[in-house]
Swiss-Prot record:
The keyword Membrane applies. Residues 1-12, 70-72 are cytoplasmic. It is a multi-pass membrane protein. It comes from the Eukaryota. Present with 98 molecules/cell in log phase SD medium. The keyword Iron does not apply. Keywords: Membrane, Transmembrane, Transmembrane helix. Residues 33-46 are lumenal. Belongs to the TPT transporter family. SLC35D subfamily. GO terms for cellular component: membrane. This is Uncharacterized protein YER039C-A. It is found in: Membrane.
Length: 72
């Protein structure tokens, strides 16, 4: 089972279409989130929102690297 899981993560990590789709999905999700949050009344914490987004992105990439899905 462990070998099968390792083969699956290697095939996903080296897959061009999976990389493209995940990039498009994350880009669209961030854009929609930014538009929604920035348009809220009395919202003035732009740098906090950017920090949180950067932190979540970095932590997600680190987790994916540990699992073996992302290679960098």
């Amino acid at each position: 089972m462990s070998k099968h899981k390792h083969e699956w993560t290697e095939s996903v990590a080296n897959s061009g279409p999976a990389s493209i789709l995940s990039y498009c999905a994350s880009s669209i999700l961030m854009t929609v989130t930014n538009k929604f949050v920035v348009n809220l009344d009395n919202f003035n914490m732009n740098f906090v929102m950017l920090f949180v987004q950067s932190l979540v992105c970095t932590v997600t990439l680190c987790i994916l690297r540990i699992v073996g899905v992302a290679n960098f």
